[in-house]
Each structure stands twice: as C-alpha cells, then as structure tokens.
Regions:
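Residue(s) in the substrate-gating loop at a strand-loop-helix junction
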Residues: 86
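Alpha-helical segment proximal to the catalytic Tyr-Lys
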Residues: 71, 115-119
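Short, small/polar-rich loop/turn modules that mediate ligand/substrate recognition or access, typified
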Residues: 118, 123, 177-179
Length: 189
C-alpha cells in the first residue's frame, strides 16, 4: 500500500492536546476517528467524571480532529472522514449508557457532517462494529462473552483485522457514498 501513517500519543478528549498533535503532522486527507473507551455499569452508579471521560474520548475527540482536519480537506476539495461507532450507537446497551450515547452522537455527527461536507467532495461515513475481539470486551467474563456469541448468527466475535479491512474498503469507496453507518456485526443487530 502506498499509505503514510503516523501515530502520536495524546489525550484525545482534550482539545489543546489534539491541537498540539495536529501542529506536528501534515494536514490529513483521510481521517479515521478511532478513539474509544467504555464504562460498564449502571448509569446511577456512574460518576460525573466517568461520564465526561467517556463522552470526551469517544465523541468530543471526533469533533476536535474533524474540526482541525476539515479546513485542509475543503481547500483541497477532497477528503474522507471515517468514524468508528458501534452497534450500541444504533440500538443502545444496558449497562453501557455513556458508551451508547457517545456512539449515537458519532452516528449523528457522521450524518450531519456528511451533508455539510458533500459539496466539497468530502465523504463522511461510520463503521459500527458489533462484538470485536479486543481488550475492551475482555472486561466481560468468559461466560458473558459466550452468552453474547450465542446471539450472533456468525457464532463468533469479529476481529480487529476485519474492522481494518472494512475501513480500507470505505477509504476506497465511491465518492457518492457518504453519510452511511455501516454495521459489521456478524448479523447480530
């Protein structure tokens, strides 16, 4: 592949940190918003700080990076923004209310921003993975994971490689495809 990728460490939920990171990189033509954390538990037990941490990392970070990347894309009249959402952004999940809200916000951001940027030939889409075999899902017990897998018609969790492959496909998708929330969930939801 003829792709240049860079990685930086910063607090994605803090605009000043994201702005500092953007000052160190060339303006991106393709932006993949993939920052994500979860909180598992009852909303009534969740602290205000935890709520803000989840929303800042999952939703505000996508706003910050998009805000900083868009001027270059508009100037070039070309760009792709791919937001990583979740099936919980489509249907919500008990015990993961903040995560569901943040991913629902990602879906709304994707749809609205796609309409705003389409005249500039910038496509904005989201991928909504289901249960993917990542560290974030391994906070669940083996019993809970097995129970969820029983509900998935594909009878397994997805892999990070499958998500990456779909991201690559969306990057290379036709310019007429914008504002889409694409589920990758093994037929689960």
């Amino acid at each position: 592949f003829s792709v240049a990728c860079r990685s930086y460490v910063c607090d994605m939920g803090d605009f000043a940190s994201v702005e500092k990171m953007f000052a160190q990189i060339p303006a991106p033509d393709i932006l993949i918003n993939n920052a994500g954390i979860s909180y598992f538990g009852l909303l009534s037990d969740m602290s205000i700080a935890d709520w803000h941490t989840v929303l800042n990392t999952n939703l505000n970070a996508a706003f910050y990076t998009s805000k900083l990347a868009i001027p270059h894309m508009v100037h070039e009249k070309w760009g792709k923004i791919i937001n990583i959402s979740s099936v919980w952004g489509n249907v919500g999940a008990s015990m993961e209310v903040a995560y569901s809200v943040s991913k629902g916000g990602i879906n709304a951001l994707t749809k609205a921003l796609a309409k705003e940027l389409a005249p500039s030939n910038i496509q904005v889409n989201a991928i909504a993975p289901g249960m993917i075999d990542t560290a974030m899902n391994h906070v669940l017990s083996e019993e809970d994971i097995s129970s969820i897998i029983e509900e998935i018609p594909a009878d397994r969790m997805g892999t990070p490689e499958e998500v990456a492959h779909l991201v690559w496909q969306v990057v290379n998708s036709p310019s007429y495809m914008t504002g889409q929330i694409i589920s990758l969930d093994g037929g689960w939801i």
